[in-house]
Structure formats: structure tokens, C-alpha cells
Amino acid sequence: NQHNEFVQSLLGPRQVAKPKENTWDGASRDLSIVYGANTEDGRGNVTAFFTYHDQEPVLQGKRDWSACQVVVSGAGVASCAGSPNSNQWFRADGQGGQLAVVGNEFVPWSATGATSPPPFFNSNEYSYLMQQSTRYTAGFFAKYDVNDHFKLYSDFSFMNDRTNVQIAPTGLFQGSGPSPTSGFLVNCNNPFMSGGQRTAIGCSADDILNGESVDMYIGRRNIEGGGRVGFYEHQNYRVVMGSRGDIVGPWKYDLYGSYYYTSLYQASQNYLSISKIQNALQVVQGPNGPVCISGGDCVPYNIFQQGGVTNEALSYLAINGTSRGAVSQRIVEGSVTGDLSEYGVKSPWANDGVAVNFGFQTRREHLEYTPDVAQLSGDLSGAGGASVTIDESIAVTEGFGEARIPLIQDVAWAQDVVLDLGYRYSDYSTGITADTYKVALQWAPIDDIRFRTSYNQAIRAPNLLELYTPQSVTNTSQVSSDPCAQGAPSPASLAACLNTGITAAQYQNIPQCPSGQCSVLTGGNPDLMSEEAKTFSIGFTLTPTFLNGLTASLDYFTIDLEGTIGNIPLGVIMQRCLETGDDAFCSQIVRNPVNGALFGDDVAAGGYINGANVNVGAGTTSGVDVQVNYNLPIEMIGLEDYGRVSVALNGAYLIEATTIPLPGDPEYDCAGLFGPQCQTVNPKWRHQMRVNWTTPWDMTFSAAWRYIGEVKLETDTQEPTIGTGATNPFNHTLPARSYLDLSGVWNINDTFTVRAGVNNILDQDPPLVNSRIAGTGLPNTYPTYDLLGRKMFIGFTANF
């Protein structure tokens, strides 16, 4: 059901269609088959499987809360916004103001103007909230025991998935043109322009006579051609072959090799060619009508008047792109396990001896990516700039050892005291070497309770994608305006702006970032080092004999992370550069070298803030995990004839989630907060609680309560770096969300089972968030929450 009346009230003024009050969509279908058989001699077994999954898409425009991009002004006034890359023109030198096409004239652009295309483009009408996908998997697990020394095993799996992605139409995007300023050149004697249009963009009589060109930033959607479509296909293979068994005495071995391969085919369809757009805008009057200056098969592109675009022009401009890639992994691992009690190696106070395991692993991973010529050249308008070819590998060799040492057993107040030790040495081909280890202790004073504590020092080396993902330029709402450009809502001083790479003449004359989004460079960094983590935990498990059926555990943990792989928050880069002029920050601001703009879509052309992966600062996360399982003794109240009832609770309390963005910076704590720097929703408490009733009538009913606690906006706090102490009138707090799921299973007989249920039965919408705060790629909220609403399902199982 559509029941967000607040967002619905914003749709009308922007001429956005309201979704149907009741919508059924997002259907999915699943099929799985499992077959198993034993060999005649009883020493082998094979289990084979096949699965099929098909998911129908859901458009963002089919939910009222996501039907448009909700933005909120500083005064707390909400409205439906969108991209001015719809019908907005202005000179690349910033002179002359913003214009829109109406009829065959330029008029001053207005956010509320009635133009076609409209002043703001609503991309949500085209984009998916849930993508379409089709997936097949198949494989087998096999084993055969030749004898006690050779127990052979093998796994094989195959997966194919195909996804169609739709996003808003391509077009001409401000800052994506081929001119030195990343604009498009429009010749003043273009016959499609009226006299008023020539005057509006600053063409003089001599300019018209000589055919001079004006460098323009043009935002104009290809509404005539429809949305862009992306097709992705992955094929995945994994094979494992190994042997395990006895060596001699207490010693056993396990040796295996595995190979993993995933291929990618990607097609980008219904795009326009940037180079052809430029050709089609350079038009003069020929003997039989307007013709392109470039000649050849070029067809003039008339975007200077409403209804001027022809199908012939669209056919000329159309371009598709394809790319292929693959990721592979090879592993060889061997280990030996032994119980040293046979040699008398044990504690004098324990019954069991020391158990050890040691071994090695070699692993090699390879990444390759090959775009076609169109994507290599960056000619697809709206595709994020030029792609690059990748052919990179990582290799690692590791040796490890573990020991389990029972210290005390079966004595008063020490039923079991066990020490676990582990060590691993890793040598990466990227130059990283690491010694990691763990120490853990368990103590069970009585059978009813077991205490545990552990300390681990570990690393996470950067993976192939973090190292070698191609760098590209895209839009970001983390920095929604350039404080040194025209019309900045909070302009910085000239002295501060000089730090960011502008000239005094450019101050407040630079074109402003369109659509409330400046540009960011994202991608890999081959110079990354490993993350280092130190983890401490302490907890207990309670299984009281005086309360049969109860199992409860509680664990406190703290994780200290250094050298986190991520990016410096873009707002921090801009603010620190303005305030300090520190080159560590200012060098990350790469302006367009011609006009100083901070937007574009090409790495070489500049106009972005560097948000590529780096090893940034440090952080600490601590909290408490809680698990409770209880089989209720309903027989004690005379209900034994009604089956069994069980309750399970899994919860987490977040004590702190601190971040030090850069060495020497003050830390800020995101526990209980959300926002651009905290990046996601960090509730202090969340849980899932499930109650199962297993009846004596071959039916089981289940109710689950999913809870996400309240969070506050980071800027409304006094946290260093991220807090301002102000109160946001719209998003001060995101209230707690509770979801109720109901399901049931009916075992009709030994062969047939039916299951059905409803998730989010109360149809809770996600909380509404200013889209310039969320910055998640989703409209107006975070993916932490349930996005689709009430979901019903039914399934059928047959065992033969």
C-alpha cells in the first residue's frame, strides 16, 4: 500500500505521477532439485543439485517514498528535485546565466518552469529499486574412501546469472563534452537557432558571419530515445579435488587444490556518442537544408527547439558499448593434524593431550578486464568516462600452525580449561608480509557455564578490486556545491578558495556543480597497504541445568583497526583545504584547468575531488552480542498436547564506532548516528527475535520481530569533525523500525511439504532521508531498512 502522504504531496508540483495506491510487483520464482546416491560398496557418495531463480524488477517510481529525489533546504522545506541535466544551458565561462529551451527560444531557466524536457529530470521514474535477475546453479559433492589413508573428495559448482539494469536516459551532460572545458561547441550560424537564441548565448554579428562557436555546458536528456539499459552476465565455475586420511599413529592429513573462475560480459545500450553529438551540433545551412560541417553520414541534432529531434538524428548518435572480464583463483592447501597425547604431551591436570594442526597455503588471484573501443575512448555519454584495460594478479604464500592445549579438566571449579594458540605467516606478491596470531582461553567452572576470552592480531590485504579497479569520475552528493563557484549557498572567502586551485579572477565566476552534485574520482590504488586489526573479546555461554532448554550467550568485543582501506570523506577534504591550505588535502581537489569547475566525467579533463582508495586513519568498534535460545516447558502448565514452543533472540548493542579520518585528527563516534561521514545507519541496538510453535499436527508456525534502533543525524551532535551542534528540522532523528514476519510449514506427509508466509506484514516504509544526506545510491533512505514493503511467499517441497 502507498501511504506516505508527505512524499505524495511533493509529487504534484513537480508533475511526477503518483504510483498506484495498491501495487503487486517484484515477483520471484525459485526451483531447486537435490539428488543423492551411494556406491554399491558403501564407500562413496554423490550429491548433485540444481537451482533456478528469477526476480522481476521493481521501479523506484512504483513506491511513493522513492518516486522522486527528496531534497530539503536549510530551512527544512522539502521538495522533489532531480537533475538539471534535462533542459539547462549556460556558457562554460559562466557568463549570461542559465537558460532553457521553450519553443524555439531560450528563456531564463527556472526550477519551476514548464518546459519540455522539464527543468529537473526525475531519474527515479526509470531506475530500479530491485533489479531484474535470472540465475542458474548446478553442481555436485562427491567422496570415495579408497582406504583409511586415501579418502578422496571433490566438489564442483557452476553458476550463470543475467541481470538487466535500467537507468534514466542518456543525453548531453554538463561537464562531459569534448571541448577543453568539457563543454560542447555550438556555432553561432547554426540554422536551428533563432535570432533570440544567438543573442542569448552571446553571439555577435561578426561571430554569426564568421561561424564562431560558443563553448556551452548543456544538460539535455534524450527523452526521445528512452532509458539506458545495462546487461550483465556472469558465469562461475569452481572445482575442488582433494584427499584426506591417516598418515601414521595419531597423524592425519588433508591436501586439496581448488580452481575458481568467474567471467563477466557487460553491454551498455541506448547511449549517445559524445563525438557524434559534437559533430551534430556543428551545423550550417546547405542547399537542401541544414547539414553537418563534418559531412559524411552525420545527421544534424536539433535540440534548439521543442520537437526538433528526428529519428534519423537518434540513429546517427546511437552507440553501444561492451566489455568482458574475468576473475580467477587457484589454491593449493595442505595441513597435518595430530593428537600428541599418544606421546605423553599433555598437562598433568588434564585428561586430553595437546592437539596440533599445521600446514601451508598458496593462492593466486588474477583479474582481467577488456572494454571495447567505444568504452576505451570514453565516447559513451553518461557512462562515467573512459574505461581502461586491466590485467593484474596477486599471489600469496602462507604457513600456519595451531595448538589446542587442555590445561585442567574434571576438577572442582575447573571442569574444562583450554588454551588455543594460532600463528600464520603471509607473504604477498605486492610486497606485504605479515605475522598474525591468536590466543584464546576457555574456562568451564561447572557444566552450566563456560567463560571465554580471546585476543587476535590480524591483517586484511587489499584485494584485486581495491588495488586495480579502473578509476573513473562520477557525481556525488557528499559535496553538493562548490563553495568557490557562482551561487554557492555558503561561499568561502577568496583566500580560502585560492587554496583549492582557483585564480582570483575565477572566484565566484566558476560554473556551479549541477544537480547538487560535484564530481568524485573513484577506483583502485595499487599502492595500498594492508589493514591491521586487533580484536579482544570476552564472554560466556550459559546452559543451566536448573532451567532445562535454555542456552544463553553474551560476548563483549572490541576491534581496533589501523590503515583502513577506504577514502577520505570528500567533505573533510574540501573543508580542510579551505581552512588550512594543507597540500595533503588541497592536492586531492583537481579542478578543470580551463575554467576551474569541479564537475565532469573524465579523469584527464579534471573537475573532481579524489576519492580513490587509500589507507586512511584508524577506528575502533566495540559492542555486545547477545544470543538466547529457550525451549519453553509448556508441559509444566498442562499444554504438552499442543506441541513445543521455542524462542530465539539474536541482538547486538553497539557501544562505540569511532573513526580517526587521518593521523592526528580527533576521533568521532558514529554509534547511534547516521549521515554522510558515518556513511550508514549505526543504531546502538538491533535484534531479531523469533518464536516457533511446532504443533503435534505436522505444522510449524513462526513469528519474527526484526528491530532497528533509533539513530540521530551526525551533524546534530557535538562530535568532532562531523558535528555542528545545529538541529536539522527534517532529519534530526530516524525513529526505530520494527518489522513483523509470519510464516508456517505444513508437512503433509513424508513426501510433501508446503511453506508460506508474509514478511513485513505491517507494510512498514523505510524512514525518509534527505537524499543529499543519504548518498547511498538509493533514493531517500538507507539499504539497512526494508525497501519493498509487504512480501508474501509460498513454497512446495517433495522428497522422493
Language model regions located:
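Transmembrane beta-strands of outer-membrane beta-barrel pores
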Residues: 1-2, 41, 52-56, 158-162, ...
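Outer-membrane beta-barrel translocator/receptor signature
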Residues: 1-60, 64-66, 132-138, 149-150, ...
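Residues that define the transmembrane beta-barrel architecture of outer-membrane proteins
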Residues: 25-31, 132-136, 235-237, 328-332, ...
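Short loop/turn motifs that connect adjacent beta-strands in outer-membrane beta-barrel proteins
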Residues: 40-43, 147-150, 246-253, 341-354, ...
